[in-house]
Regions:
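Transmembrane beta-strands of outer-membrane beta-barrel pores
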Residues: 24-30, 59-63, 90-96, 111-113, ...
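Residues that define the transmembrane beta-barrel architecture of outer-membrane proteins
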Residues: 35-41, 68-72, 99-105, 129-135, ...
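Short glycine/proline- and aromatic-enriched beta-strand/turn motifs that initiate or cap beta-hairpins
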Residues: 14-64, 122, 210
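Repeated loop/turn-to-beta-strand initiation elements of outer-membrane beta-barrel proteins
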Residues: 16-20, 51-57, 82-88, 113-120, ...
Length: 211
């Protein structure tokens, strides 16, 4: 649903800017002692639909023999004040016995300069508002002209508490094409937070294109 919304919205805004990344991904996960190792694809979409609306989406799809991995995260931010935004966030992970989906609504504080940016956000599950929470931060570092490092951390307090950490590096090869390197780790625990259910990581490499 989130992906469809983004594509429809992108078409609607003729002045939109988009950075699309397509990469080869290597997946390594463990569910209660059972290991899953395989490969697949990783899609990244980042852009601005209007001066007040920005979005970010990451999708991973892989296969481990006859088991399929689907992992996606996305957010849309609507700026209501210069540094304050309303955030619609969604995530999904499906692998073997683990199937978790979260849709949250919240607020964020955003501060950006030419070489540094930080976003701090917090929200609550739409279906259980005030019961389950999502919170985290995202930092953008302009290492040098034409290169950028993004670090992010997110915790989703739901039926299975999920913690995600990401590191993504983009190096511009030309005006429109860039090298895309990334690492993402995911860990989910049971409802009590006492035992790890899923733990693993995704490493990917590919290219980005700016429209």
């Amino acid at each position: 649903i989130l992906l469809a919304f983004l594509f429809c919205a992108t078409t609607a805004f003729s002045q939109s800017s988009i950075s699309a990344g397509l990469s080869y991904g290597s997946f390594n996960y463990d569910i209660s002692g059972t290991k899953y190792t395989g490969d697949g694809g990783v899609l990244n979409l980042d852009g601005q639909l209007s001066p007040a609306i920005t979005y970010s989406l990451s999708m991973s799809d892989g296969k481990f023999d006859d088991v399929v991995l689907n992992n996606s995260e996305g957010s849309i931010t609507y700026s209501v004040f210069p540094n304050i935004g309303i955030d619609f966030m969604g995530s999904q992970i499906k692998l073997a016995t683990v199937q978790e989906t979260d849709t949250s609504l919240g607020i964020s504080y955003n501060l950006y300069t030419s070489s540094f940016g930080i976003k701090v956000f917090a929200g609550s599950d739409i279906n259980n508002y005030g019961k389950f929470y999502t919170y985290g931060t995202k930092v953008n570092l302009g290492i040098s002209q034409g290169s950028n490092l993004t670090l992010s951390y997110k915790t989703e307090d739901r039926k299975q508490k999920a913690t995600t950490m990401d590191a993504r590096f983009i190096y511009d090869l030309t005006t429109n094409i860039g090298l895309n390197l990334g690492y993402k780790s995911t860990e989910t625990k049971n409802a009590a937070g006492t035992a790890i259910v899923l733990k693993g990581n995704t490493t990917y490499a590919g290219f980005t294109y700016k429209f």
